[in-house]
Regions:
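Aromatic/basic micro-patches that form nucleic-acid/chromatin recognition or nuclease catalytic surfaces
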Residues: 242-243, 286-375
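Conserved catalytic cores of phosphodiester-cleaving nucleases, focusing on short active-site segments
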Residues: 70, 96-127, 140
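Non-catalytic C-terminal interaction segments of nucleic acid-processing enzymes
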Residues: 144, 150, 155-157, 162-247
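Flexible glycine-rich surface loops and low-complexity tracts that mediate binding to linear polymers
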Residues: 27-40
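GIY-YIG nuclease catalytic motif and its immediate N-terminal context
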Residues: 235-297, 321-324, 367-390
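Acidic-basic catalytic patches of nuclease active cores, encompassing PD-(D/E)XK
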Residues: 22, 55-87
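Short aromatic-glycine-enriched beta-strand elements
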Residues: 1-2
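Beta-strand/loop nucleic-acid-binding surfaces
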Residues: 9-23
Length: 390
């Protein structure tokens, strides 16, 4: 639920989007509300937040409506010679968004995913773990062996991205699977290139070789709800599948202390911690998810790292993974200081060998960092750009 304000009046709104939307949810963001139709007795709110203004454009929030856009304006553009479109097609125990049949009688099974996370020229999906998306992808890979032409269509709903990458930071299992089972759909007509040349083009662009065709297209929407297809083919980059499967990278841990306290921190002795927010920067070249989950536990663990002494006192703890090819924890520590964080001297930085720009890996903030747009933009820059640089 989102609480909107019209002047001094608070309006509770349903948000029909399963993502985390961390790039959008800041006070003062302009929403587009749609009054719920009469007769819906189960509705808990009178309005639905169907869109948000972001970078002077409208970003749709109603992810399910991507299917309607696909049916009306996208599918015929990306799959040639379609003559039949059947929505919500059931096959065995599974239901797929569309079954399409082309003029040659080829049966196309299609799943549509709305993509609203676009930063630094890179669109990513999903922005929260999606077991359902993984299940559909695995089913499509199996069905492709039975003669179906299988597709996943990512409908990018704002901005002008240069490429699409599966989001290995928030759902590495899905990202690895998409790279394994998928290939970038060929934007060139079949008569212009042989299958071999098309495959060479895909491989050169990191497009994968799996059986499921992966499409990314750009939909632009106005504040009246009217949409048009701005680009039928956005480059699909599946080259980071091995990184997604490696479970390696960096992380930030956001910790809230409700009260000021004195804490004994191993060899550092007793440290005075003010009430407020702290962010810890770390890395793991293997078992990244386990490392983060260990930090999030307050009990039942031996104290190995400095952070282990702090987390039992936390009111809230949040892990922010950043999959990466390189160790970036010192770079992240520098970023935290640049954002105004106050270092806790030598905390977590004993292996930095006294790096002058890295006095600590733990920084204090008076306000919640994830509520600071500059902090979120830094996180997204590392996820969309820096972490993916070799």
């Amino acid at each position: 639920m989102i609480i909107a304000k019209d002047g001094k009046t608070e309006i509770p709104c349903h948000c029909p989007n399963p993502g985390r939307l961390i790039e959008f949810v800041f006070p003062g963001a302009r929403l587009i509300l749609e009054k719920r139709r009469g007769g819906n007795e189960k509705a808990k709110t009178p309005y639905t937040a169907v869109g948000i203004y972001y970078r002077d454009a409208v970003a749709p929030l109603f992810s399910a409506r991507a299917n309607k856009a696909a049916e009306q304006i996208i599918l015929k553009e990306i799959i040639p010679n379609i003559k039949e479109i059947h929505p919500e097609f059931t096959l065995g125990d599974s239901r797929f968004d569309f079954l399409c049949i082309d003029k040659k009688g080829v049966r196309h099974l299609i799943e549509v995913k709305a993509c609203s996370l676009i930063e630094y020229g890179v669109a990513m999906f999903p922005d929260a773990p999606s077991g359902r998306a993984l299940k559909h992808l695995e089913e499509l890979a199996e069905l492709s062996a039975l003669g179906y032409s299988c597709h996943v269509v990512f409908v990018i709903v704002h901005s002008k991205p240069e490429r699409f990458i599966p989001n290995l930071h928030t759902d590495p299992e899905f990202a690895a699977a998409l790279s394994k089972y998928g290939h970038a759909a060929d934007p060139w007509p079949a008569e212009d290139a042989t299958v071999k040349v098309a495959a060479q083009r895909r491989n050169a662009a990191g497009g994968g070789t799996g059986p499921v065709a992966i499409h990314a297209c750009l939909l632009e929407c106005g504040n009246t709800g009217m949409a048009h297809l701005a680009a039928a083919h956005i480059q699909v980059d599946l080259s980071h599948g091995e990184l997604a499967a490696s479970d390696a990278g960096n992380y930030l841990i956001q910790i809230e202390l409700a009260e000021t306290c004195e804490i004994e921190v191993g060899g550092l002795g007793t440290i005075h911690f003010k009430a407020g927010w702290y962010v810890y920067a770390g890395s793991a070249r293997k078992n990244l998810a386990k490392r983060i989950n260990r930090h999030l536990r307050k009990i039942r663990k031996q104290k190995h790292w400095h952070i282990d002494y702090l987390t039992p006192f936390a009111k809230t703890i949040k892990g922010l993974p950043i999959m990466s090819y390189r160790n970036l924890e010192c770079d992240l520590a520098v970023e935290l200081q640049r954002l105004g964080g106050k270092p806790v001297p030598r905390f977590g930085s004993s292996d930095c060998q006294g790096h002058p720009k890295c006095p600590s890996h733990l920084y204090y903030f008076k306000e919640r960092p994830m509520g600071n747009r500059a902090f979120v933009e830094m996180l997204l820059r590392y996820r969309h750009v820096v972490g993916l640089e070799g």
